[in-house]
Amino acid sequence: VMELGRTLVKEKEHLKHNIRFICFGAEEIGLYGSRAYCEAHPDFMKKIRFMMNFDAAGRAGRQGFCLHGWPKLEPLFRDVIAEIGTDLPMWTQVGPYSDHWPFLLQGVATATMGDPDEAAKRGGRGFGHTKFDTVDKVDLRAMRECAGNAAVAAFKVLNMDDWSYQQRTQAEIG
C-alpha cells in the first residue's frame, strides 16, 4: 500500500480524481475496522468508484485481480492487464473474509490482488494465521509486482472521465 502511494504521489499532477488509502488491521477477528469505516462515512460510500483490497499482497504467485462478482469490470481489467504486458490472472469470486466485504455490501465495486493458482497449490492457509506467519515468508518479488500492477490499475481508474460502473443497489446485492 505504501509503495503504491509513493508511486502515485509522483504522478499526482496527472491524476484526474482523488485516491484514499486506508489501512485496517486484524481483519481476521471480524472486519471491525472496515465495517466501522463504512458505517461512519455513509455519504462518502456513495462517491467511491472502486475499492482495491491488498489482503493477499506478499504471497507468492502472479499478482492478478480478483473481481468480487463484478463481471462488468472485466473489460477494464483486461485493458489493465494488456497495459502491464504480461500474463496475469483475472477471476471472480465473492467471499466475505476480508476488508473488501463491508464496501461490497455498500454497493462499491471491489477487487483483491492475488493468484488463484498459487492459492490452490498452497492447499489451505500455508503459514498464514499461525505463529510461523513471519516477515521472512514475504515474497519481495510478489510485493513489487503487486505494487506495480496496482499502480497501473489505479492510474487507469483515477483517470477515467466516464465511470460507467455504477454502484449496486441493496436489491442488486441481495
Locations of regions flagged by a protein language model:
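Generic, well-ordered alpha-helical scaffold segments in large soluble proteins
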Residues: L4-E11, A40, V80, Q106, ...
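His/Asp/Glu-rich mid-to-C-terminal helical/loop segments that flank catalytic regions of hydrolases
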Residues: R6, K10, K121-G174
